[in-house]
């Protein structure tokens, strides 16, 4: 088993797509995933197979699947293997597997995993010793906080964090603690969860006032929200720390059923802020959560033709689609300005429009629009045609259309359609193995390099292209 292939799979979403693995599990195809994990050395299938087997209590079979992956020494597989061994009751073997070696002493993931497995084995103090027995950094501090939650060791953790936090407060520039400013937030979190909320709030407020640590205002606002201190939170949200406090304040009001106050506060900020974009986005989200879709659109529609970052058109479309209002989202694509269309129609707007039409029962109209355009002007043209055929109820035509097509998008849609037809083995067969996917990726980037060399950009910037997904697929996936 090749570790480089495993690393590539994880870093490039290679192998069998996770969405397909989940669908196969939902259809009871665990044995098929076991077969593919072993035959193709497919990491996502191995994870899915282990998840399915463990859900059925078949821990020894799960170890049989994950064991060869763990034997490579690749850290994600080592951790997955140790978790399975713990569930098998083979505690000592799990600890031996996950114990960091000499060459891994600086590998944070290895020490985090070791500490978590120690806690899983009931060895909480040993986990604390393992983390604090090596040079501390901010990730290790947060690992210490995470692995000890609910383990009855808060006082010990506070004894460890207290001196570090005090040094940071006294002189954050000293070399010993310059890289440990998160000790302030970590100490506050542990004080809060141990019930010492007034002490936590006092320290957090002082740190925010003195601007100690990164994101002190946000930490203070979040703590006030978690403690239900709405009056104090309002003071923050209407003062110099408003940028950090508004979202926690609005969400706290909403949780209390005081949505009218939340809306009023946001509308006031939209009217008065020099740069209201963040508040407009929060207002859009708030109104969407309340099911007030038309009001949400009206609140931000003045941004829909902006050519800069403050444009909330796509955000509104995605939120509406998530609520099943594809029809209303589709309406937002109409009436856009010529300047906006010139900059955005070919890039993403029409792809999103076709997706929304497909979801709204207008797949045939979308396909007609698509086919009227020159073929070289539409990215992922053939997979999009196939998807629209399927949305129009012509699934077999869509499958036949996809079979000869190259490319990740084509075989992903094909596999999804086959799963929907209950043709599970065919769906797996439609997915190229890892070596084929790697070769496809190399060819893609080679073509891109040749294209850039042949037609250099007028601006000197390299054009960006994405080999994997068309813009319209983002929300649906």
Predicted feature residues:
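Solenoid-like repeat scaffolds
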Residues: 5-11, 34-42, 66-74, 99-106, ...
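Alpha-helical segment of the N-proximal tetratricopeptide repeat
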Residues: 6-36, 42-56, 80, 84-86, ...
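Structural register within alpha-helical repeat arrays
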Residues: 19-20, 46-49, 80-81, 113-114, ...
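C-terminal non-catalytic interaction modules
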Residues: 395-396, 402-404, 411, 415-477
């Amino acid at each position: 088993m090749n570790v480089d292939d495993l690393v590539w799979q994880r870093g490039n979403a290679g192998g069998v797509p996770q969405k397909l693995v989940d669908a196969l599990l939902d259809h009871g195809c665990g044995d098929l995933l076991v077969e593919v994990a072993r035959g193709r050395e497919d990491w996502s299938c191995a994870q899915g197979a282990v998840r399915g087997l463990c859900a059925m209590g078949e821990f020894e079979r799960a170890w049989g699947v994950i064991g060869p992956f763990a034997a490579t020494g690749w850290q994600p597989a080592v951790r997955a293997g140790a978790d399975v061994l713990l569930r098998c009751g083979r505690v000592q073997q799990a600890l031996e597997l996950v114990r960091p070696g000499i060459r891994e002493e600086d590998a944070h993931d290895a020490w985090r995993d070791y500490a978590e497995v120690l806690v899983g084995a009931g060895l909480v103090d040993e986990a604390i010793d393992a983390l604090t027995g090596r040079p501390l950094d901010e990730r290790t501090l947060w690992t210490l906080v995470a692995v000890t939650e609910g383990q009855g060791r808060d006082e010990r953790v506070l004894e460890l964090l207290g001196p570090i936090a005090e040094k940071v407060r006294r002189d954050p520039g000293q070399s010993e603690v310059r890289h440990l400013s998160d000790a302030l937030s970590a100490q506050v979190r542990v004080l809060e969860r141990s019930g010492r909320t007034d002490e936590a709030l006092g320290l957090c407020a002082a740190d925010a006032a003195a601007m100690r640590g990164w994101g002190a205002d946000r930490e203070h606002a979040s703590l006030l929200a978690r403690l239900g201190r709405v009056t104090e939170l309002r003071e923050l949200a209407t003062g110099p720390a408003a940028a950090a406090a508004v979202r926690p304040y609005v969400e706290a009001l909403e949780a209390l059923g005081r949505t009218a106050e939340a809306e009023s506060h946001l509308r006031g900020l939209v009217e008065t802020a020099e740069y209201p974009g963040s508040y407009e986005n929060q207002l859009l989200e708030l109104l969407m959560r309340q099911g007030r879709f038309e009001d949400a659109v009206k609140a931000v529609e003045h941004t829909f033709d902006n050519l800069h970052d403050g444009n909330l058109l796509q955000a509104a479309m995605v939120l509406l689609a998530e609520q099943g209002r594809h029809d209303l989202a589709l309406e937002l694509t109409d009436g856009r300005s010529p300047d906006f269309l010139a900059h955005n129609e070919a890039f993403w707007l029409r792809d999103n429009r076709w997706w929304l039409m497909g979801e709204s029962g207008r797949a045939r109209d979308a396909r007609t629009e698509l086919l009227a355009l020159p073929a070289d002007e539409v990215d992922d043209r053939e997979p999009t045609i196939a998807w629209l055929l399927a949305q129009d109820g012509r699934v077999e035509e869509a499958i036949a259309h996809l079979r000869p097509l190259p490319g990740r998008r084509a075989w992903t849609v094909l596999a999804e359609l086959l799963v929907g037809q209950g043709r599970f083995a065919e769906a797996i067969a439609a997915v190229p193995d890892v070596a084929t996917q790697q070769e496809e990726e190399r060819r893609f980037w080679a073509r891109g390099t040749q294209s850039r060399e042949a037609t250099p950009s007028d601006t000197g910037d390299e054009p960006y292209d994405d080999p994997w997904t068309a813009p319209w697929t983002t929300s649906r996936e």
